């Protein structure tokens, strides 16, 4: 018999509905079937706007230190960041990605079997550490009425090659799953590189070139098709022909925009998971924001968080446990009896959690 695997998981609810969906996910993990032989130990950690207001730091050093020294993985809830400059504040999720070496943001978007509209089954792989998100901005000229600001957009060969390799690995993995017959949507493996090198020939040109080079790094990638899309054309095609895409790889900003847009293809940001992935650590994170308008009302949709837990478990090698979560969640959504208001229902976070757990144990 295989031994029970202990996972020490850092829980970072952060702000808004993060404080509701992360506890729901904890309950889910605590009640996974014994057959999976997983034991979770949880460490509660601070970050976010609320933490900044209390302590003056959005990401306490203690949080990073405990993640690095005590945790196998982490679950992040949601962050409420101001839209204007606040002295001393910097986004904790962006900082965590850099400090933990989480160079890839992986966001699967998949419609339910039998759902109306065109079938959607794609993954957006977003470079997580560079582009405009290096946050190197400055005011060049500060004369009232004539102010000029500029920002650095950094693209490196190393980071672009790494994210390209991740995209090819995911495409290869998805093809293996399709060949096993467990996917209802069949397509050839394809990596689509997103860029705007017709305008930004140096930065996006380097990203494009590096992603293409990544295919040559492993002979097993040779059977994977590759194409390219200019980012504005990609926006059009994503909404018109989502069934044409498999794995989409993009620089940070483009990937951020495309992945949120892709969520609309399946109905709600509350359904879409993501994982921030590094060489030795994964931090899952639902795509939705902190939703302050519904925070504290008990109606936050935990589905994206549950799927984020499943995605985290996939990257940690626990595919069977992940599959159980995906199946249980999909059944709740397909039946349509227990849905939160964002999906047209009247149920709350706890009711959704109860229904998912009931499916897992049946």
Curated annotation (Swiss-Prot):
It is an enzyme of class 1 (oxidoreductase). It comes from the Eukaryota. Gene3D superfamilies: Isopropylmalate Dehydrogenase. Signal peptide: none annotated. PROSITE patterns: IDH_IMDH. The modification Phosphoserine is found at residues 81, 91. This is Homoisocitrate dehydrogenase. The lineage of its organism: Eukaryota, Fungi, Dikarya, Ascomycota, Taphrinomycotina.
């Amino acid at each position: 018999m295989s031994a029970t695997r202990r996972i020490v998981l850092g829980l970072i609810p952060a702000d808004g509905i993060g404080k509701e969906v992360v506890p729901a996910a904890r309950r889910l993990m605590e009640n996974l079937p014994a057959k999976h032989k997983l034991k979770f130990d949880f460490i509660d950690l601070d970050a976010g706007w609320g933490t900044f207001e209390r302590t003056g730091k959005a990401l306490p050093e203690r949080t990073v230190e405990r993640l690095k020294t005590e945790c196998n993985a982490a679950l992040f809830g949601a962050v409420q960041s101001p839209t204007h400059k606040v002295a001393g504040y910097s986004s904790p999720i962006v900082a965590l990605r850099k400090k933990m070496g989480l160079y890839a943001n992986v966001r699967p978007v998949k419609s339910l079997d039998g759902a109306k509209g065109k079938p959607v089954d794609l993954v957006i792989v977003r470079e997580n550490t560079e582009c405009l998100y290096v946050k190197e901005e400055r005011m060049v000229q500060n004369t009232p009425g004539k102010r000029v600001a500029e920002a650095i957009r950094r693209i490196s060969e190393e980071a672009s090659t790494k994210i390209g390799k991740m995209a090819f690995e995911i495409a290869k993995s998805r093809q293996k799953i399709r060949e096993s017959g467990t996917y209802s949507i069949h397509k050839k493996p394809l990596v689509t590189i997103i860029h705007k090198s017709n305008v930004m020939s140096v930065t996006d040109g380097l990203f494009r070139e590096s992603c293409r080079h990544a295919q040559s790094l492993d002979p097993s990638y040779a059977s994977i098709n590759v194409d390219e899309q200019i980012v504005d054309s990609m926006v059009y095609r994503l909404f018109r022909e989502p069934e044409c895409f498999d794995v989409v790889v993009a620089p940070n900003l483009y990937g951020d925009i495309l992945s949120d847009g892709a969520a609309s293809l399946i109905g709600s940001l509350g359904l879409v998971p993501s994982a921030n992935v590094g060489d030795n650590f994964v931090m899952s994170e639902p795509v939705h924001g902190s939703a302050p308008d519904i925070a504290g009302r008990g109606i936050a949709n935990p589905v994206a968080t549950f799927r984020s837990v499943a995605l985290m478990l996939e990257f940690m090698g626990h595919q069977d446990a992940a599959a159980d979560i995906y199946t249980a969640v999909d059944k709740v959504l397909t039946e349509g009896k227990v849905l939160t208001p964002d999906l047209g229902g009247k149920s709350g976070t706890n009711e959704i959690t109860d229904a998912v757990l009931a499916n897992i144990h049946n």
